[in-house]
Regions:
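Acidic/histidine-rich alpha-helical segments that form the ligand environment
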Residues: 92-134, 149-155
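Charge-dense, low-complexity intrinsically disordered segments
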Residues: 9-16, 20-23, 99-106, 110
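Short, contiguous alpha-helical
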Residues: 2-5, 9-11, 19-38, 42-94, ...
Length: 182
């Protein structure tokens, strides 16, 4: 994310239908992440704030993992994509956070962008195969199966939580603040 064009913040439609509003809200959160993690070197992506070990690089890698887990594995029942397909999360449940320090900014950004691109295609596939009511390919421990609608809400929540973290970390790196790159 070397340019502001990577971090275009798209507003959801002010009076859109449910699908356009959900997808718009998710894309807006992705845009915030792109902006807050953009144009940083390795030191910026490895910076921490206070006692936390969270970094913007770890955040990018984590969100790439979540994109893959939610839309490839849970929604469609497909195998994990690399690098997640060879990770022993039982040995290190936070592997993506810990291993991000070994990756270059370009690797982290590419990993996240590729995961987002795959997710967009997988969501479009699910929309064509049942819309927001399409059920996921997995069930919760209590036997219920979430719909695409629920998975989109969960992803919006995941991103919104981490955008708050990204705001604080990025401000500590170089003073960048705000909600809009304009």
């Amino acid at each position: 994310m070397d340019s502001d064009s990577d971090a275009i913040l798209r507003e959801p439609p002010p009076a859109g239908n449910e699908l356009d509003t959900l997808l718009g809200a998710l894309e807006r959160q992705r845009g915030y992440v792109a902006w807050k993690c953009g144009n940083l070197d390795s030191a910026g992506l490895r910076a921490t704030l206070g006692p936390s070990t969270m970094t913007l690089g770890g955040l990018l890698k984590h969100l790439a993992a979540v994109e893959d887990d939610v839309f490839s594995v849970k929604l469609h029942g497909r195998d994990r994509h690399p690098p997640w397909d060879t990770v022993d999360f039982g040995a290190d449940p936070d592997w993506e956070w810990h291993s991000a320090a070994e990756d270059s900014p370009g690797q982290l950004v590419s990993l996240w962008q590729e995961a987002v691109s795959r997710s967009r295609a997988l969501v479009a596939e699910a929309i064509a195969d049942g819309g927001l009511d399409r059920l996921a390919s997995y069930t919760w421990p209590d036997g219920r199966t979430p719909s695409l609608r629920r998975l989109l809400i969960d992803m919006i929540e995941e991103y919104a939580r981490h955008v708050g973290h990204a705001d604080l970390i990025r401000e500590s790196v170089d003073g960048l603040v705000g909600e809009d790159p304009e």
